[in-house]
Amino acid sequence: MNKTYTLNNGVQIPAVGFGTYKAADGKSADVIKAAIGSGYRYFDTASFYGTETYLAEAIRQSGLPRKDFFIASKLWKTEMGYENARDAFRRTLENLETDYLDLYLIHWPLPEPGYENWKELDRETWRALEELYAEGKIRAIGLSNFLPHHIENILAGCTVRPAVDQIEYHPGYSQEAAVQYCKENGILVQAWSPIGRSRVLKDPLVCELAAKYRVSPAQICLKFAVQRGIVPLPKSSSPERMKQNMDLFSFEMEQEDIWRLATMPQSGWSGEHPDQERVYF
């Protein structure tokens, strides 16, 4: 699986990545090592995940050169602001045992719901990323969980346009307005939680399509992203499912089925929204 997309600055990015959130809950790099063994080369981490050092260990032990990997990380809500962002980036490089990142994102647009000066804070943070990009320390810069009104604020004052916006995206929560906005503005959408939750995997439509195409319900969810030009970032601790989650190019869904998935009633939402308190189910 060598399919890639070209970002708006010409950088090539793999079409599927591996999400490392909770990938080191056992305080070991074993899950990430298994993902490398399963063929993943694009890894998505974040300072908040606590997995940067485990990813570094797994890459070091793989024996593969750094250039074979596409490594993305994010700065957390408490690391926003110009100086904080530069400090956060330096810590991330140390944790990852590398001298550059392929992609660096602002994790959330607001440090907390209701934060009044978020526009200024976001622009200040973005300026730090632009400088790091200009210094050659990051190959591409982007956003995470930013909705159109947040992105507009960045675009109004940036010198480097965001290459990526990583949002929650899966059947039952496909954030169509945000996806459309990003596509119109040359921003590649990435999907976190691309499989949704167990409710999505058990959804009658998802199961019907899995039977129709002779794949797993998870593969239907991931293909839903891929077929719409969105990069899914699945995570799994099972080597068998890791491989399955990469096998997305041996089948194609009919357009009618894509529309059916896109118009499913809301299901499997994480409860997270950048402008509001988290909802717990």
What annotation goes with each model-predicted range?
Residues 8, 56-66, 93-98, 155-158, ...:
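Acidic (Asp/Glu)-rich catalytic clusters
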Residues 111-281:
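Beta/alpha (TIM)-barrel catalytic core signal, keyed to glycine-rich beta->alpha loops juxtaposed to Asp/Glu
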Residues 42, 100-103, 140, 164:
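Residues at the N-termini of beta-strands
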Residues 1-69, 196, 281:
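N-terminal binding-site loop/beta-alpha segment at the start of enzyme catalytic domains
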Residues 66-79, 103-109, 166-169:
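A short, structured active-site edge motif that brings together acidic residues
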Residues 23-26, 44-54, 78-83, 112, ...:
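Acidic-and-aromatic substrate-binding clefts and catalytic sites of carbohydrate-active enzymes
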Residues 24-35, 81-96, 149-151, 174:
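Short, acidic/polar
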Residues 85-106, 131-135:
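CE4/NodB-like, metal-dependent polysaccharide N-deacetylase domain
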